Amino acid sequence: MKIVIQRVKEASVSIDGKIAGAIDQGLLLLVGIGPDDQAEDIDYAVRKISHMRIFSDSEGKMNRSIQDIEGSVLSISQFTLYADTKKGNRPAFTGAAKPDKASQLYNSFNDHLEELVPVKRGVFGADMQVSLINDGPVTIILDTKNR
């Protein structure tokens, strides 16, 4: 799994002009599923994201987690994180998991994360418009294959 983690003041996702999900302070996650991903990748990602200390404490140090601040997550499926740009000018996305597998793992990831923090979701495979106000900005890339 490849996940772009962005600390946000607020974020929302719209589909066909209608808001499908919105959060206040928390994390916007762009979630890509690879062909070799499985349950252990989900467990690792959920553990890291829910405990990652990237929110400021009273002294301004990044010392608090999403759970500590009682924040929320907006999770967006993002197969383009597996783009291959080596040849030509048009990215290839053959490195991403097939849609059936990716959808199942994406939903499982969100279900597991939702046991720890509130999660709003985009719609897998939909054309979405994502709006956000970055906080910091703080943007971290998590790759479950690089542990």
Swiss-Prot record:
Record motif Gly-cisPro motif, important for rejection of L-amino acids, residues: 136-137
SUPFAM superfamilies, per database record: DTD-like
Domain of life according to the entry: Bacteria
Catalytic reactions of this protein: glycyl-tRNA(Ala) + H2O = tRNA(Ala) + glycine + H(+); a D-aminoacyl-tRNA + H2O = a tRNA + a D-alpha-amino acid + H(+)
GO molecular function, one term: Ser(Gly)-tRNA(Ala) hydrolase activity
Enzyme nomenclature, EC number: 3.1.1.96
Biological process per Gene Ontology, one example term: D-amino acid catabolic process
Subcellular compartments: Cytoplasm
GO cellular component: cytoplasm
UniProt key word Cell division: no
CDD domains recorded: Dtyr_deacylase (cd00563)
InterPro entries the record matches: Daa-tRNA_deacyls_DTD, DTD-like_sf
Keywords per UniProt: Cytoplasm, Hydrolase, RNA-binding, tRNA-binding
UniProt domain comment: A Gly-cisPro motif from one monomer fits into the active site of the other monomer to allow specific chiral rejection of L-amino acids.
Family in the record: Belongs to the DTD family.
Function according to Swiss-Prot or TrEMBL: An aminoacyl-tRNA editing enzyme that deacylates mischarged D-aminoacyl-tRNAs. Also deacylates mischarged glycyl-tRNA(Ala), protecting cells against glycine mischarging by AlaRS. Acts via tRNA-based rather than protein-based catalysis; rejects L-amino acids rather than detecting D-amino acids in the active site. By recycling D-aminoacyl-tRNA to D-amino acids and free tRNA molecules, this enzyme counteracts the toxicity associated with the formation of D-aminoacyl-tRNA entities in vivo and helps enforce protein L-homochirality.
NCBIfam families reported in the protein's UniProt record: D-aminoacyl-tRNA deacylase
Subunit structure: Homodimer.
Name of this chain's protein: D-aminoacyl-tRNA deacylase
Naturally occurring in which organism (per UniProt): Streptococcus equi subsp. zooepidemicus (strain MGCS10565)
Lineage, opening ranks: Bacteria, Bacillati, Bacillota, Bacilli, Lactobacillales
